[in-house]
Each structure stands twice: as C-alpha cells, then as structure tokens.
Amino acid sequence: MAKVLVLYYSAYGHIEKMAEAVAEGAREAGAEVDIKRVPELVPLEIAQKSHFKLDQAAPVATIADLEHYDAIIVGTGTRFGRMSSQMANFLDQAGGLWMRGALNGKVGAAFTSTATQHGGQEVTLFSIITNLLHFGLVIVGLDYGFAGQGRLDEITGGSPYGATTIAASDGSRQPSETELAGARYQGRRVAEVAGKLKG
C-alpha cells in the first residue's frame, strides 16, 4: 500500500476542499493518506482582518515528514502567477532532502486555484512541478482519462498538469463538482502510480 501525503496551503479554504478531494481519490485507490498544511507566514492580526480561514483541521507539516511518503501531492493557491510564498518557503527549506536524494523516485503532483479562469493556473502548476522535479519526483498530472477536462458547458478548472479550481475575485465561488471530481481523479492516479512504483 502506497503512503501519500497531500501537502497544501489554503488561505480561504478553496485549496483545503481540493486537498480533501485529492485525499479521497487516493484512498479510493487503496493508499494510506495524510493531509498536512504548511505553516502560515502572515501575522495573525492581518490574517484575521483579511478573513483567512484559520480553523483548518490538518496538522502542520515538517520538512522531515516528506521522506516518509511514497507520493507527495502539493496544492496551493496562485499568487500573481506563481505558488504562494508559504508553500515556496516550505519547499525552500527542503534542501537537505534534495542534497541526500531523499525524495528521488517518489511520485509528485500539483493542484491549484486562481481567482479567475485565466489567472495563472498552469504557470502556478509549473512552479510547483519544477520544484518537485528538482527533488527527483516522478510527476503525475490530470490526464484526459478524466472526462471533465473536455467540458464546454460550464466554466471549470482543470489542466493536464493538475487539478484546479476557480475561486472568483472575491473568493465566493467554491470548487464545483467537476473540479472536485478532477481532484479525486488525480489523487487516484497518483496513488495507483505510486503503488506500481513501490511494487
């Protein structure tokens, strides 16, 4: 059985919901799954004034956690066309793991959210995937076996590079069922690939 870590940062809860769906999909494929979040860098007073979702149940991850999993699925909201500074800060601290090759051969994947349909989803996914490739992970995207990729009857996230959601400029839009289904699909695929690589 593959061990999968869903590692995320979510300021307003959209990525938290996507992380739960990713984890659900991985569990459906028989994986043992943990959901963890990276530390918040925004001072508490500012986070409260900005209405950040501060009641997230997932425990905070440590760098040492990463090498204990067969797969790591990373999710974060987009910040001006790149991953959030919270996630970048966390991954930047994993240089020791990189130096030892501790993550080589593990499976990696990425998911994200943006405020708008063309708000930088794919470039954000690439900013995550680039990091994972440097760490030696084998990348799994959201392949076209997921039928929701081809929908034209609704505005929806999703890319061959990873599951995505659109939150709206004011954060009022929650992940749609199609977007959550894409996240579950990607979680399943990662768990399946990790299981095969683990043997």
UniProtKB/Swiss-Prot annotation:
Q: Which residues bind substrate?
A: W98
One GO cellular component term, please give it: membrane
Could you say which residues bind NAD(+) here? Answer: Y12
Task: Please give the start and end residues of each transmembrane region.
Answer: none
Cofactor binding, per record: Binds 1 FMN per monomer.
Reported EC number(s) for this entry are: 1.6.5.2
Q: So what does this thing catalyse?
A: a quinone + NADH + H(+) = a quinol + NAD(+); a quinone + NADPH + H(+) = a quinol + NADP(+)
Instruction: State the Gene Ontology terms under molecular function.
Output: flavin adenine dinucleotide binding; FMN binding; NAD binding; NADH:ubiquinone reductase (non-electrogenic) activity; NADP binding; NADPH dehydrogenase (quinone) activity
Which sites bind FMN?
Answer: 10-15, 78-80, 113-119, 134
Name the domain of life. Bacteria
Q: The Flavodoxin-like domain covers which part of the protein?
A: 4-190
Show the Pfam families listed in the entry: FMN_red
The record's listing under SUPFAM superfamilies reads: Flavoproteins
In terms of InterPro entries, this protein maps to: Flavodoxin/NO_synth, Flavoprotein-like_sf, Flavoprotein_WrbA-like, FMN_Rdtase-like_dom, NQO
Needed cofactors, names only, are:
FMN
The UniProt keyword set, sorted, is:
Flavoprotein, FMN, NAD, NADP, Nucleotide-binding, Oxidoreductase
* HAMAP family given in the database record: NQOR
Question: NCBIfam families, alphabetically?
Answer: flav_wrbA, PRK03767.1
- Please report which protein family the annotation says this sequence is part of: Belongs to the WrbA family.
Please report the name of this protein according to its UniProt entry: NAD(P)H dehydrogenase (quinone)
